Design a protein with these regions (language model features):
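Catalytic-core "active-site belt" of small-molecule-metabolizing enzymes
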Residues: 2-144
């Protein structure tokens, strides 16, 4: 197993069990390509159906906090969506809540050369709904 596959399996197990892990022993995300590779491997290791995607660090302030200069994206897993009124156990590493706008698409937007214009994206949106994200870390941090 490669270092990347090992780290992906560790992250997937922590996510699946809502447990905390010690910080990963070796850096594997030296650049965007390595981070994307780790994310893809962890998603594959989880094996959970993906219900949608989220974006983060969409403002300069959020990017400064996250030590990045660009927004990033990640999957929203189907087994992590709850309807209004659901009782949810807070995971270890819980850090807080974030209020979000969730966009429900009326049709898939397949990846394509050149991407999409804003007007093409707007007509693909079926609904805008409120959402609440439970923010949690998977790594044991100082004071946790």
């Amino acid at each position: 197993m490669t270092v990347l596959e090992t780290h992906a399996a560790i992250l997937a197990r922590a996510f699946a069990t809502t447990g905390l892990i010690d910080p990963l022993p070796e850096p594997v995300v030296a650049d965007d390509a390595a981070a994307a590779g780790l994310q893809a491997a962890a998603i594959s290791a989880l094996g959970s159906p993906i219900a949608g995607w989220k974006i983060g660090a969409t403002s300069a302030e959020a990017q400064a906090i996250m030590a990045t200069t660009v927004p990033f994206y990640g999957p929203v897993f189907a087994d992590r969506l709850w309807e209004d009124g659901a009782e949810i156990a807070l995971p270890q590493g819980f850090r807080g809540f974030e209020c979000e706008f969730a966009l429900r698409l009326g049709a898939d937007l397949p990846r394509r050369e050149g991407g999409y214009r804003a007007d093409q994206l707007a007509i693909a949106v079926d609904a805008v709904v409120p959402a609440i994200e439970l923010v949690a870390t998977r790594q044991r941090l100082a004071g946790m």
